[in-house]
Design a protein with these regions (language model features):
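Conserved acidic-Pro-Pro-aromatic motif
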Residues: 65-145, 149-155
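SAM-dependent nucleic-acid methyltransferase catalytic core
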Residues: 2-70, 74-84, 99, 110, ...
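Short, well-ordered beta-strand micro-motif
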Residues: 2, 155-158
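Flexible, glycine-/basic-rich loop-and-beta segments that form/coincide
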Residues: 160-163
Length: 163
């Protein structure tokens, strides 16, 4: 909570050594805690099983028919200067996206309802071309040039939507 509230735009990112490397925010009116919300969350978490495992292990072990699963992986960069994969020391590369696409198909065959978001790139479109893909105009909060704070993302589902 501290990192989310005190860092630039609530961003989480690491360097190649796996060290957190986001600058502090300039906002002096940061509210670190919301006691009421923390107490409600604490109460809910008492009934929750928390796991510290790779996403693929969790999904292979626990996903079952009719589960609704939302996947929001680090986005595949749309250019050499965009970098949305540095959330872990190992990063998340195209091969990781290919493995995720295979798992998406396995979960589909299992009867899960799936929603995945990602960048609108030819590679990602090809990986999920068997499924329903919607392209959405998006706004970015982080870009040094204000006129470049827009883009296109995709939502992939294995069921029909009205998006």
């Amino acid at each position: 909570i501290f990192l989310n509230r005190t860092c630039f735009n609530g961003l989480y990112r690491v360097n190649k050594k796996g060290e957190f490397n986001v600058p502090f925010a300039d906002n002096k009116s940061i509210k670190l805690t919301d006691e009421s919300n923390l107490l409600k969350t604490s109460k809910l978490l008492k009934k929750t099983k928390l796991l510290s495992l790779s996403y693929d292990l969790v999904l292979k072990k626990y996903a079952k028919k009719n589960d609704l699963i939302f996947l929001d992986p680090p986005y595949l960069p749309v250019s050499k200067f965009s970098d949305f994969k540095r959330y872990t020391k190992e990063q998340f590369h195209l091969d990781d996206h290919k493995k995720l696409a295979i798992l998406y198909e396995e979960l589909d065959k299992k009867g899960c309802y799936l929603i995945l978001t990602n960048s609108n790139t030819p590679e990602i479109l090809k990986l999920y071309n068997k499924f329903n893909i919607k392209i959405l105009n998006t706004k970015r909060n982080i870009n040094s040039k204000g006129n470049l704070r827009t883009g296109k993302d995709i939502i992939v589902t294995n069921y029909e939507t009205n998006i």
